[in-house]
């Protein structure tokens, strides 16, 4: 499962969601407005910035297409 930590006001989060949608990739969006989601984000990445994508055991901070595509390829094999 792919998890996407995001916030409503984050432009990069919107771009990342559009990118995943364009590739027909399913993901679970976790809004960091929730205290629990924010705490989980910090535990995973060591920061409070979004977007953060979790693919398998890999945590990707920011909208890094290369890293995202690499991890997506791994789980699609």
Language-model features: locations:
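Short, structured secondary-structure boundary patches
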Residues: 40-43, 47-53
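ATP/adenylate-binding site constellation spanning eukaryotic-like Ser/Thr protein kinases
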Residues: 7, 46, 65
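Thiol-based oxidoreductase modules, predominantly thioredoxin-like and allied folds used
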Residues: 25-38, 47
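Short alpha-helical
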Residues: 11, 36, 67
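C-terminal basic regulatory modules in eukaryotic proteins
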Residues: 55, 66-77
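A short, hydrophobic beta-strand/beta-hairpin element that forms part of a small beta-sheet core
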Residues: 51-61
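Class I S-adenosyl-L-methionine
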Residues: 14-17, 21, 42, 69, ...
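Local sequence-structure signature of Cys/Sec-based thiol-disulfide redox active-site neighborhoods
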Residues: 1-23
């Amino acid at each position: 499962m792919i998890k996407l930590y995001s916030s409503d006001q984050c432009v990069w989060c919107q771009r990342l969601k559009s990118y995943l949608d364009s590739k027909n990739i399913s993901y679970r969006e976790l809004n960091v407005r929730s205290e629990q989601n924010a705490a989980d984000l910090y535990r995973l990445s060591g920061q409070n910035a979004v977007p953060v994508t979790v693919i398998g055991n890999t945590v990707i901070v920011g909208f890094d297409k290369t890293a995202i595509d690499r991890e997506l390829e791994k789980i699609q094999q």
